[in-house]
């Protein structure tokens, strides 16, 4: 279940026109993927002893020093895993959700739309489309039993949901071939006093264990025991006038509407020679390029060709949306794929506004370039950053062309090195990354000790969670 942000009281109008209480704050709230209910986010900071549920789980304590990297609980005996689900209150029952079934997918869609994320003023709410959920929940090798629901026995109404999907990750020099990504924990608003969150987490964990999966990655906007990394949200206005008209982007002091519109102006056409939509034939080249780029990071998602096809093309033969857009740069002479970038769509409904019904939000996803430096020279690093700026600026141009209103990103990959130059502003939202049942040293997430964006070094995070 997504949660409200811990707010940072520092605001900089020099870097962004988003003001405190405005669109930046709201988009930060809508950007989080977490395993904690909304009301927990508003609570004061907790000590480890306050986390009654997480104290029972194989996760690091806050003050643990990693003396040996690896699983916290080394037991991987499937025979010791309970075969029966955890017990629920008598009025509820477990359900395995078949997301290939339109009716059941519609139930998940309705639950998430009405309960998953809503800002504190009830003015913005995620507006999922069914194809987004299929994309997110049905990657290669997905396990049907990992789409876990809770129904009311008497009415059969779906009132809670949690999901996991399979993936492989690398943590420094250790590969976790069988891992899970846990997401979309959602509980009906009227049932959040029923303590369903721990049961949902335990049940999806049990089902993962039955598939011989013992580690999982997940994120939270609040601090839990104990994150492997912390990153920050950044936002770039594409349609400043619309955001202003909605009432979430007031004028910075001394500015004018003309100045703000000009500040975020983008050219009508992309700037990178050889840029074109990704096609099915590009999958092997993109997989190779992405794999090489991921070597740069301490924690990385390891993509197979099948996963590249799913996550960056989905059902397209030529990338065309409406869920994910992917582009490659092809050298016109050698025909080699030299660069790749992608972004996905997750809009929000604007509640109670007579003029606008939604905010169209694009999210920077994965990218890669063969200009990624193989040495530590400042010249190589600078050339790479300039290349990233060029291709991600083209992503902005394309997102503007496709009528997106705002472009969001997190300070993972190398984003922290160049997004400020593309007029992204620092958001107030932060995202903690966790690995269940795994202990390792902390990994930089693109921010410094004061939680400001660190422009001096790349992040160590080669992982983007939708």
Swiss-Prot record:
Active site: 466 (proton acceptor)
InterPro entries per record: Acyl_CoA_acyltransferase (IPR016181), NMT (IPR000903), NMT_C (IPR022677), NMT_CS (IPR022678), NMT_N (IPR022676)
Keyword annotations from UniProtKB, A to Z: Acyltransferase, Cytoplasm, Phosphoprotein, Transferase
Catalytic activity: N-terminal glycyl-[protein] + tetradecanoyl-CoA = N-tetradecanoylglycyl-[protein] + CoA + H(+)
Residue(s) carrying Phosphoserine: 17
Region of interest (Disordered), ranges: 1-21
Biological function: Adds a myristoyl group to the N-terminal glycine residue of certain cellular proteins.
Identification of the protein by name: Glycylpeptide N-tetradecanoyltransferase
Organism for this UniProt entry: Schizosaccharomyces pombe (strain 972 / ATCC 24843) (Fission yeast)
GN (gene name): nmt1
